Regions:
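Glycine-rich phosphate/pyrophosphate-handling loop used in enzymes and phosphotransfer proteins
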Residues: 1-208, 212-243
Length: 243
C-alpha cells in the first residue's frame, strides 16, 4: 500500500474515533467493525432495479414499456441517467444529509453508487463529473452543496475528474418542490451559467440528490450542450416511481 493511502486510512480511523460515523439510514453511531452503515440497516434501502425507464431511470411497473409516462410526455435535454434509491425508502436519510449537516453520508452514498451502478458508469465513459450547483446564498446558509459532496466522493473512487466550478447557479430560484412542471421550467430559465470553455469535454455526468421531473438537469444540460458538450448523463441518489 502506498504511503499516502496508509496516511489517508490512519486519518480516517482517527477521525472516526473523535467524530464517530453515523449510519445514513438510522442515524445511530455505526458500531466498530461495521463499515459505513449499520449491519442491521443494510437491507433497508430499496434500490431501483430493472425494468427502468431508458431515459430517467425510474422503476417501471410494467415489463413491456421502455419509457415512463413522464418521459413519453416530454423531451429531455439530458441523454439518460440512473437513480440509486427509491425516494421513499431513503427520504429521511436524504433530508438529514441535505438539511441536518450529515456530510459524512456522502461517502456511503458514493460507495453504494459505485457498487450498484459500476457497469453503467463504465459504459458512460465520461470525461467529467459535474455536481448540480446551488445558488451562493443557499450554499452560504446551508454550509455546503450536497450534490458536490457526493460528486467529490464519486470522483475520488472512480478516478473521473470533478469539475465543480464549471457550472454556476446565478439565479436564486424558488424551491422546485413547490412548483408545477411548467413553473419549474420557467423558474430555471437563465438560472445557470457555464464559467469556462467546455469544448474539450465530450461526455459528462451530472450528479444530484433527488430526481423529480428532471427540469433542473434539463436546464444544466441545455447550457452544457450549448457550449459544446455532446452527451450529458446524470446520476441521482433518489427518484420516485414511474408508470
Amino acid at each position: 500500500m502506498r504511503d499516502y493511502e496508509t496516511g489517508f486510512r490512519i486519518k480516517e480511523a482517527l477521525a472516526d474515533l473523535v467524530f464517530p460515523r453515523r449510519c445514513p439510514v438510522c442515524d445511530e453511531i455505526v458500531p466498530m467493525g461495521d463499515k459505513l452503515i449499520c449491519s442491521r440497516c443494510r437491507i433497508k434501502p430499496q434500490y431501483i432495479r430493472e425494468p427502468r425507464c431508458r431515459r430517467c431511470g425510474k422503476q417501471l411497473m410494467g415489463e413491456n414499456v421502455e419509457f415512463c409516462h413522464d418521459c413519453m410526455q416530454r423531451k429531455h435535454a439530458f441523454d439518460y441517467g440512473y437513480a440509486l434509491y427509491d425516494y421513499q425508502s431513503m427520504r429521511k436519510s436524504i433530508y438529514r444529509f441535505k438539511y441536518g449537516r450529515r456530510c459524512e453520508y456522502a461517502k456511503f452514498y458514493a460507495e453504494d453508487i459505485r457498487e450498484k451502478l459500476s457497469d453503467e458508469i463504465c459504459t458512460m465513459d465520461a470525461d467529467a463529473i459535474i455536481p448540480v450547483p446551488v445558488h451562493v446564498s443557499r450554499r452560504r446558509s446551508r454550509g455546503y452543496n450536497q450534490a458536490e459532496l457526493i460528486a467529490a466522493e464519486l470522483s475520488r473512487i472512480t478516478g473521473i475528474a470533478m469539475h465543480e466550478k464549471l457550472v454556476q447557479r446565478i439565479k436564486k430560484t424558488v424551491p422546485q418542490k413547490e412548483l408545477t412542471i411548467q413553473e419549474r421550467q420557467n423558474n430555471l430559465k437563465k438560472a445557470f451559467h457555464i464559467s469556462t470553455n467546455v469544448v474539450k469535454l465530450n461526455k459528462v455526468i451530472l450528479v444530484d440528490d433527488i430526481y423529480t421531473t428532471g427540469s433542473t438537469l434539463d436546464a444544466v444540460a441545455v447550457e452544457l450542450k450549448r457550449r459544446g458538450v455532446n452527451v450529458v448523463y446524470f446520476i441521482a441518489l433518489c427518484i420516485g416511481e414511474g408508470m
